[in-house]
Amino acid sequence: MKFTLNWLQKYVDTTGLTPTEIADKLTMLGLEVDSVAPIFEELAALKTGLVISCEKHPDADKLSLCQVQVGDDTHQIVCGAPNVREGLAVTVALPGAVLPGNFKIKKSKVRGIASAGMLCSERELGIGEDHDGIMELPEGMAHGQRFIDAMELSDTFIEVDLTPNRPDCASVIGTAREIAGKIGRPLQIPVKDRQIEAESRDFSVEVESSELCPRYTAKLIKNVTVGKSPWWLRKLLVSVGMRPINNIVDITNFVMLEYGQPLHAFDFKKVAGNKIVVRLPRENETEITTLDGTKREISAEMLLICDADKPIAVAGVMGGANSEIDAESTDILLESACFNPVSVRKTARNLKLPSEASYRFERGVDPGGVVNALDRAAELIAEIAGGALCSEGIDNYDGKKAVEVQRFSISRTSSLIGVEFSGEELTAMLTSIEMVVEKDPENEDILLVTAPTFRIDIEREADLVEEIARIYGYDNVPTATPLVALSYPEQDDDRLKRYPLALKLTRIGFNEAINYSFVTAQHADMLQLSEQDYRRKVVTLLNPLSEEQAVMRACLLPSLLENVKRNISFQKTAVKLFEIGKIFLAQGEDVQPIERQCITGVLSGNKFGESSSLYFKSANVDIFDAKGTVEFILSEMGLTDLANNEKIEFTVPPEGAREPFSTQDYALTIHLGPNVLGTIGKVEEEVLKSFGIKHEVYYFDLNFDALCALSPQTKAFSSLPVYPAVKRDIALVVPASISAGELLATVRSSRDKLMEYAEIFDVFEGGKIQKGYKSVAVSITYRSQTKTLTEKNVEKSHSKIVSLLTDRFGGSFRDA
């Protein structure tokens, strides 16, 4: 809804309020203000002038050489307008002024004659479409004034974004009513409480469906003169972005904006049979040419306004070209009606013809205000276009609805808003927005409220409470701290571990995946699970969205493998994903499934990521990357050393205990004593094929709930080492069946007092290494807490560890 501050001022006195304050009050009333801005500021540099002489240009028949007085100065201006003449008050753009469209005025020569400015037409000023001549200002207007001051164009534009439940505010009067109620000032309405006194005999109206057209009113105005609208009317329309057309059409548009009631004017001489019929199309009526000159197809459900022979308008949307007002029209049939909102909405959408009228009809117009708008427009037409005004007309109101009275509790309203109101205060606020309020003779706490017909959103007591809150002011409601007993949620220790761990995994190159808990039942077959595997017993959904989401997942790995396939299809050369989520293990009918939280990860492609240097392009992930990630997880969770000196171990599972989707050569079980905490491995090629993956994929799968339940060993802190460390590397060639982890565990179990740390840094097969054997390289750090080690001290401890490895594993050593 668009209006200006000066227009609003015609209906409610806003003296003392700035545009910003008015916008704030509208916002607090629940009307969202989109914009507040001054208008016609681009015309501020223009002046009023007086043509004191006008002569023909010596070198051009169609140009005039004018002397124009602007204040104390006289300017010579060459003008080509046919209506320029001596004594004419004009709008002058002097050099330096900028017209709409960024047209800069400069001193120039026109056919050899100097011209110091421009006399402007309405189109050049952006306030109309007339370009046949310059704009003629009122006779006797003082020259030298600012044009926007002289023509009262200086104004503020306000645009309000209305919600669908407030069609009453799709008018300037409706908005003024809200402001008046808020600031406690009277509302001035030009025409109200009108009724059609007598039925006209000059024409007839027939409405075939009162459901589609609850009310239809019309008046005939004779002997009008169609012409240009007066300046005040054109100015108001232009200020809100509407194009003036002629006095009749401009009046209907003005009243629509003023009252929120769309109107339409027919040329009565073009209405066959002097009859209006509101009906649906006949079988042979398939198209109509609307006012914009476009032929439009009409369908069977579109409501039409017809004369005795043919359709002459699409109800609530647009008039027909066969009955439009033109310069020759003298008798006007003025329509003011109420159409079904749903019907108008469908018609406007189907015709792709939104309009200001359909905008209001779609939201619902006031059936009680139809005659007020009709009379207001009729009076303006008689005043401006010289028509003969008569009181007769036709009012077909077959769709009138019974008035509903709402019971309104004073005490409940006070309780809900938090302010103690009296019945008199509530009555004053409601009557300020034109509601009728009476006391209930049987109950002092109850007011009987009748909402006006334009408030279609008032349906129950809660709506009235909202009206009181709006008018009183939400910002005036006192704030009070609610007395609520606070309860703190139980601390989720697992969650406190989950988030930091996920964050740290992303920092070492992983991406977190969050997949649906609903998966396909085919996953068990794709993983090659045995018939006895507990993960085949799934929780089935009663109403799945699709077959792809028919069961609850019993394992996180399948969804991650689908993620791998998708990433590879997008040319990702390095994929590292993990997910921390729940799996659901069925326990039989009528028994809740076990929910277990797991952390599962997959690794495929380049070891160092897509941005790795050329040197590392061929380095792909292997089982040690998966194992290293698990060790990182255990370390970050503080589970490297457990209470009671327990240790989490990695072992090669026996053949029957290996995961069916893991290869035989690359499989590890993670356990704490007899309890299995998870597995690591390389996914079988056949399993990968079932997921459409052609690249190697390594995985880890851990019971996160079980890990969170473990108690880490209390850390014992010692002072920082003072003496330097000595590193020695050894490489042992052993049978390929011996795991590197077993060899490392042997080194660490030596318990040599000088050995501080040991780690494997290389495992190598092939080359000069005998087939069936591999080289395992171990780095050992030696340090003393009391002295600097000598070569002799280190050699003694190192030899001891070498002997230990030789005795246990055999093989040969090579000093690294």
Swiss-Prot record:
Signal peptide: none annotated. Its main location: cytoplasm. The keyword Flavoprotein does not apply. Its cofactor is Mg(2+). Binds 2 magnesium ions per tetramer. The keyword ATP-binding applies. It comes from the Bacteria. Its EC number is 6.1.1.20. One of its GO terms (molecular function) is ATP binding. This is Phenylalanine--tRNA ligase beta subunit. The gene is pheT.
